[in-house]
Regions:
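Cysteine endopeptidase catalytic domains of the caspase/legumain-like
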Residues: 1-125
Length: 125
């Protein structure tokens, strides 16, 4: 379903392919992608909601993302790792505040918007 009135003219890209024979055999191919292709936006929580943090360890989302990246970076693509992180934040974290019990047991879920058109893996060092 439509989400607006605008048309995406896209962006023109060029890819050069070098032949092993000589530099004169180089082939340049041209192709077009949507303007917003290959964007990934990750927010610690959904629009309008509080993003929780531990005073000693930092935000739930960033701490979880670091742990997930550390554990899965060699075998798993980034979008899958963000999904793992979102599940962990949503299910394993709850707020606690000994000064203000009204904000205890509150939850959070990260918001991931992907316009990726390919899987993104991190290469080994």
């Amino acid at each position: 379903a439509c989400r607006g009135e605008e048309f995406d003219n896209g962006i023109q890209l060029r890819r050069g392919i070098t032949s092993s024979r000589s530099e004169t055999d180089n082939v340049v191919t041209s192709y077009k992608l949507p303007t917003y292709a290959d964007f990934l936006i990750a927010h610690s929580t959904v629009q309008g909601f509080y993003s929780w943090r531990n005073p000693e360890e930092g935000t739930w989302f960033v701490q979880c993302l670091c742990d997930v990246l550390d554990e899965y970076h060699e075998t798993t693509d980034l979008l899958k790792m963000l999904t793992i992180c979102a599940r962990k934040v949503a299910t394993q974290y709850s707020s606690y505040n000994d000064v203000n019990p009204e904000i205890n047991d509150k939850k959070q879920v990260p918001s991931i918007t992907s316009m990726l058109i390919r899987d993104l893996y991190f290469s080994p060092k």
